[in-house]
């Protein structure tokens, strides 16, 4: 195939280790340099800018292998890779349109518009985002109280302190 499309889940600042391993094996195989490379990264955060590092990692890989980097699409706001249909995503309509545009780019071997991910992004009003953050913080603090954790002291710092004593 003369076109590679990498589809990977994305954590806040990295692609999974298994995906990195696949990229490393492809790099070692030194396959043909005349490949077109596209990427789709999916993460749970609704804002796509939190997942651009994944597309960036694949772009760096493509450039290191002297492949033709053609761009990618970041999909945020829900699971797609776990087999849930697109229609169940909260931002299903814009994501579907953006995927169609990406497919057209792969068929015509053209670059993906860098603003495509922004078009797929969920539009969350500021006050709703604030409410979501307050709810998330409340839930975290409630869980910390349940396990009697001091939220003002870093849990890992406490572990390190005990490790030095023992």
What are these regions (language model features)?
Residues 1-66:
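Helix-loop-strand module that forms the ligand-binding subsite of alpha/beta enzymes
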